C-alpha cells in the first residue's frame, strides 16, 4: 500500500492540515507543528492536541501516514557550541510536539558545517544531537532527509546518511527520507528505469531500505549533479515522470509517507491521483 500526499499548510491550527490533506484525497501528509521560520512557539494546548487527534481519527490518518517536518532554523551539526545547543533544544521541542500529537516520525535536514569544521566532525555532531533528542523523548523516530548539497549542507551523499546512522545509539528510532529532487541534484540519476535501479541499489548498499521511513516526491528545476535545490511539478522538470512511476510500482516503497513538495499546490490533487493510478489502486 502506498501512502501518497503533500506537505499541507497548518495555518489556523495543526488540525487544519488534516482537513486540507483530506480535501486533496491524500493518503499521507506532511506539516510543520510550529512556525518553521521562528525559534519560539507556544506550547501545544490540550485542546489543540485533542482537535488534531480527532481530525486524524475522523479522516482515517494513522501516524505511519504522517511525516512532520522540523524548523528550517535548526542545524544539528552547527560548528559553534552555543548555536548547536540552541538547535538541540529546539529539536527536542520538535520531537516532544510530535510525541504529544501522537506522531511517530520527525523529518529533518541533517545540518551544515558552515565551512568551519570538517565534514566528519559535523556528521558526528549531528549523530550526537540525535542521541540527545532520543534520550529526552519517546516513540518518535528521527528521519534524516537527504539534501541537494547546497552551500555547506551535508546529507547529499548516501555515505553521509550512513555515517550519521552509524553514530546513533538507538537504531530503532532513526530513519531516512529520500527527496528525489535532492538526490538528483546531489548526483544520483533517476531519469530512466536503469538509473532508478542503480541509484536505489546504491542506497540499499550504503544505507539500507530497512531505514527508509519516507519519501519526498519532487521533480527538479535544477540540473543533474548541480547541488542546487529547486523543486518542480512531476514530469515538468529534469527528472521526468519515469522515476515516480517506478517508485509507485516498487513494493520497497510501500507503507511509508510519500510527500509532494512540488511547486504548484493547485495541482496536488491531480498529482496524487496520477501517482495512485501508477500504483494501480
Swiss-Prot record:
- Has keyword DNA repair? yes
Q: Which UniProt keywords apply?
A: DNA damage, DNA repair, Endonuclease, Hydrolase, Metal-binding, Nuclease, Zinc
Q: Where are the annotated coiled coils located?
A: none
Tell me which Pfam families the record gives: AP_endonuc_2
Cystine pairings recorded for this chain? none
Example GO BP: base-excision repair
GO function terms (MF aspect): deoxyribonuclease IV (phage-T4-induced) activity; DNA binding; DNA-(apurinic or apyrimidinic site) endonuclease activity; phosphoric diester hydrolase activity; zinc ion binding
Q: Which residues form the signal peptide?
A: none
| Enzyme Commission no | 3.1.21.2
Q: Where does Zn(2+) 2 bind?
A: 145, 179, 216, 261
Entry cofactor note text?
Binds 3 Zn(2+) ions.
- Kindly state which reaction or reactions the protein catalyses: Endonucleolytic cleavage to 5'-phosphooligonucleotide end-products
Q: Would the keyword Amino-acid biosynthesis be found if you checked this record's keyword annotation?
A: no
**Sequence positions that bind Zn(2+) 1:** 69, 109, 145
Q: Which cofactor does it need?
A: Zn(2+)
Q: Which annotated residues bind Zn(2+) 3?
A: 182, 229, 231
Per the entry, what this protein does is: Endonuclease IV plays a role in DNA repair. It cleaves phosphodiester bonds at apurinic or apyrimidinic (AP) sites, generating a 3'-hydroxyl group and a 5'-terminal sugar phosphate.
Entry similarity comment: Belongs to the AP endonuclease 2 family.
> What is the name listed in the Swiss-Prot or TrEMBL entry for this protein?
Probable endonuclease 4
Organism ancestry: Bacteria, Pseudomonadati, Pseudomonadota, Gammaproteobacteria, Enterobacterales
